[in-house]
Amino acid sequence: MPKEGITPRAQDYSQWYLDIVQQADLADYAEVVKGCIVFKPTGYAIWEAIQRGLDDRIKATGHVNAYFPLLIPKSFLMKEAEHVEGFAPEVAEVTRAGGEDLAEPYVIRPTSETIIGYFYSKWVRSYRDLPLLINQWANVMRWEMRTRPFLRTTEFLWQEGHTVHATEEDAERETLLILHEVYADFVEKEMAIPVIKGLKSEKEKFPGALRSYCIEAMMQDGRALQAGTSHNLGQNFARAFDITYTDQQNTIQYAWTTSWGVSTRLIGALIMTHSDDEGLVIPPRLAPTQVVVVPIYRNDAERSVVMEAVQRMTAEWKGRLRFKIDDRDNLTPGFKFNEWELKGVPIRVEIGPKDIEKGSVAIARRDQPGREGKSFVPQDGLTDRLTALLEEIQQALYRRALTFREDHTADVATYDELKQQVERGFARCYWAGTTEDEKRIQEETRATIRCIPLDQPQQAGRCVYTGKETTQQVIFARAY
């Protein structure tokens, strides 16, 4: 039975999502600033956990962090034709400052290829300066017309990596390294979200890129969510901003650049992949609080005994588990159970006088609401048991999400089958169509090519739209 204040998924999935965001206390609407949200402490704590996991991987692959200006001269954006065309409708401009009109307007960073390209043109001189591998954590502004918390907001938080290389091969290697070893690895292992790694179609690729790679995840309504992108920019931005280097033969060459990023959309992906009608569900590796202890007592004498037992029990958890003790006296145990379930804490431990006598505690798993997920276990060896259970929950969430995706993905051979399948999930099909064909399909079905999977079949088949023979398969789906 769904929680009060949460619309059941089957009734209205979109409203269910908004209810989770508010009821789990993740964010608030910033009504006075169009399309923006306030990250409340729980929501921001999840973002901090995402930052830590990604930052470790980014640094482990040889990158360092820096920070570049928020304001970008408008003329910079105009230097790369495809880029400006792709972002022009979303750009916010600053035209006055200090009470005067500016000689040249600034745009508020929609992405940083242009401003970073300007500085890279100053920093790169020789092949000895390459590769240049820099990441920044920043906020971004894109003037979105239709917003939704975490998924699409006017201002959002993200990381964006920008690198410079001597050859196209090096740039391509970098692009795929980030895709596989940073993004896919993090999202699957830490967030327990299975992803499809693939190449974007010409229609869907990043404005100004040579090639765009992505990871795509399926949400519980069958729609796709682009969880991360990695772009080989070729020499487009290097030529626009004169990023050149002198090679070993003392010849001046244009460099090859990449950019890649993930954002707070990942919080939206987490909510829509794992949560249920009872509230938020957070994978243990990412959970700010992994275990909550709810002491149960009826009077001051029992409280003293129970709290002493709780302190002994949790003493060895420090440094091993992220936990909270809910010792609020003005709330009933039932209210606390409900609240922590709503907030998605992976494990709840209950302990009262009778449990102390028996040398046991009650454990409730968030991924299995109700009696199914509740058990009584000895206090002896509890720390190891909880650690193992957290990992079991992590793997169970991944398997459940993977099973859901597999159950809602189908191979389709005809356009009619495609139209039916995108109503419920991913349509995998052979594709030899044009960008114009893809646009027509989007107009008719609201589905796009989410990616051209890197894992391709060996045998040929017929294009779902044109009937031409091809060996290329794609994933069509509706998307966030």
From Swiss-Prot:
It is found in: Cytoplasm. It catalyses: tRNA(Pro) + L-proline + ATP = L-prolyl-tRNA(Pro) + AMP + diphosphate. CDD domains: ProRS_anticodon_zinc, ProRS_core_arch_euk. Transmembrane segments: none annotated. GO terms for biological process: prolyl-tRNA aminoacylation. InterPro entries: aa-tRNA-synt_IIb, aa-tRNA-synth_II, aa-tRNA-synth_II/BPL/LPL, Anticodon-bd, Anticodon-bd_dom_sf, Pro-tRNA-ligase_IIa, Pro-tRNA-ligase_IIa_arc-type, Pro-tRNA_ligase_II_C. Keywords: Aminoacyl-tRNA synthetase, ATP-binding, Cytoplasm, Ligase, Nucleotide-binding, Protein biosynthesis. GO terms for molecular function: ATP binding; proline-tRNA ligase activity. GO terms for cellular component: aminoacyl-tRNA synthetase multienzyme complex; cytoplasm. Its main location: cytoplasm. Its EC number is 6.1.1.15. Consists of three domains: the N-terminal catalytic domain, the anticodon-binding domain and the C-terminal extension. Catalyzes the attachment of proline to tRNA(Pro) in a two-step reaction: proline is first activated by ATP to form Pro-AMP and then transferred to the acceptor end of tRNA(Pro). Homodimer. Belongs to the class-II aminoacyl-tRNA synthetase family. ProS type 3 subfamily. This is Proline--tRNA ligase. The lineage of its organism: Bacteria, Bacillati, Chloroflexota, Chloroflexia, Chloroflexales.
